[in-house]
Regions:
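Conserved catalytic-core motifs of GNAT/GCN5-like acyltransferases
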Residues: 105-117, 246-261
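Conserved active-site alpha-helix within GNAT-family acetyltransferase domains
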Residues: 97-107, 212, 234-251
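Conserved hydrophobic beta-strand within the GNAT/NAT acetyltransferase core sheet
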Residues: 227-233
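N-terminal charged segments
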Residues: 1-100, 147-151
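A conserved beta-strand-loop-helix scaffold within acyl/acetyltransferase catalytic domains
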Residues: 56-57, 152-200
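Conserved acetyl-CoA-binding loop-helix of GNAT-fold acetyltransferases
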Residues: 72-83, 197, 201-203, 207-221, ...
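Short amphipathic alpha-helix that is part of the acyltransferase structural core
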Residues: 1-29, 108-112, 116-156
Length: 261
């Protein structure tokens, strides 16, 4: 059965199941720490049959671990499918391949790493008109990251500000005339991993090497204490390989449309 990780004991079990798993330990662990005792935050955390856990926020779900095999696994997949339908989740990331009725596989995400203690050659600094900011205002940053969705920008702003206020991670931006035009940040961390995310350049300023400079610079800073990891869709794999990051795995990605499923 699906159990809400709403007690200290169940939250401890949730953390045990994601321990030492790249991407999942830092992201799900940070979210549980920050939001696990605040149901009104919009985040929800569950223990599933087998070794699996589930995180939900809005229409997005993340599943780490494995459901049981055999008949118990069939029952677990049926229960999970109904649960996701009930909560209107339409995107799902998983540690392992998973077959659920009505869900279609999308291109998996590639997981990248820069090991602790390693650094990459820093790309050339941008022209002087671009001013580095190591503690930018998160409101304009959120509007840059999600320029086409105020709702997603608001969600990102809330989560990022909560993380930074609790000493988790950091944000970097390049400002042009006082406005962020390129950013990357780290808003989830475990004891051994800093997860980088939200690397975005304003389309008007793309192709100038701004993202290369910010991403490598932040990764080099963070590897002093932890390994750096992040995930990307296939279109960006060549970019990160060229910078020198190492591929270490895949994160499965699934979508559904409950109107047609």
């Amino acid at each position: 059965m699906i159990q809400s990780a709403s007690t200290p004991e169940l939250q401890t079990e949730f953390l045990r199941r994601i321990a030492h798993k790249p991407y999942f330990e830092s992201t799900l662990g940070t979210h549980l720490h920050l939001f696990g005792n605040h149901p009104a935050s919009g985040w929800a955390f569950y223990l599933l049959p087998g070794s699996a856990v589930l995180e939900l926020r809005g229409g997005s779900a993340v599943l780490c671990g494995a459901l049981p095999g055999g008949e118990a696994g069939e029952d677990a997949r049926e229960e999970l499918t109904g649960f996701l339908r009930f909560l209107h989740a339409d995107t799902l990331r998983t540690e392992h391949p998973l077959t659920l009725p009505g869900w279609q596989p999308a291109a998996p995400l590639t997981l990248w790493e820069l090991p602790k203690g390693r650094t990459l050659p820093l790309p050339p600094a941008p022209p002087a008109e671009f001013v580095p900011d190591k503690a930018p205002s998160m409101l304009p940053v959120s509007r840059l990251v999600f320029a086409e969705s105020d709702a997603e920008a608001d969600e990102f702003y809330s989560a990022a500000c909560t993380a930074l206020a609790h000493g988790v991670g950091t944000c970097r931006a390049l400002l042009h005339n006082g406005r962020p035009v390129c950013t990357v940040g780290c808003y989830e961390q475990s004891d051994t991993e800093s997860y980088m995310a939200a690397g975005v350049t304003d389309p008007a300023w793309q192709g100038r090497g701004l993202a290369r400079y910010l991403i490598v610079g932040l990764a080099n800073e963070l590897t002093a204490e932890r390994a750096v990891r992040f995930a990307c869709f296939p279109a960006l794999c060549g970019f990160y390989a060229q910078l020198g990051f190492l591929q270490i795995g895949k994160i499965q990605h699934y979508t559904t449309d409950w109107n047609t499923a």
